[in-house]
Amino acid sequence: MAVRASFENNNELGCFAKLTNAYCLVAIGGSENFYSVFEGELFGTIPVVHASIAGCRIIGRMCVGNRHGLLVPSSTTDQELQHIRNSLPDSVRIQRVEERLSALGNVTTCNDYVALVHPDLDRETEEILADVLKVEVFRQTVADQVLVGSYCVFSNQGGIVHPRTSIEDQDELSSLLQVPLVAGTVNRGSEVIGAGMVVNDWCAFCGLDTTSTELSVIESIFKLNEAQPSTIATNMRDSLIDSLA
């Protein structure tokens, strides 16, 4: 299911929220409408948490995370860190990172298995990313853009990349990520996909300007019409049992 929303009339919804299969962070402030859109879709499946990071409301651009963990910049205050820790499931590891490229959401993007990162990201940050988020890390560009988190969004089901990504690059990225990809836009033609939407394995949220065509592409590539949290959990449990057998 894909849902349209805006934060104080701003359609760059991916700046103000962070969505994974285990939790959802939503920026503090503005109206309760923004929070209630997420709460309405996610209630009973994962916690939806009001948060700020380093005193900023653009939390989606400041952090990177998946169901295993969450990385935040070193400028995150102790109170913010403690609040997020208390609100997230115990299985989610949270860690502060000393990184020059501190807008982690712009320079990294990941699902539960693979991460793409800015070619100049610190080696130490890459190791922490692999350890805390339990992902394989690839230094990559998307359509020659180094801000992979801004121009690419993917879940465990599929992904959308910058509209000017060549077919060869799409194929290369798709084989790295092991998910189908499509070149597309959100918010009526915006190339900055990471800022315009958030997605997990059963739900997507995008800006109010997103057209019905863009919405149908999103629902199709992320397989949102087939997905429900319960079936995903069951599939994950079955595969886990198989791997342990």
Language-model features: locations:
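The feature marks the mature, well-folded catalytic cores of soluble enzymes
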Residues: 1-245
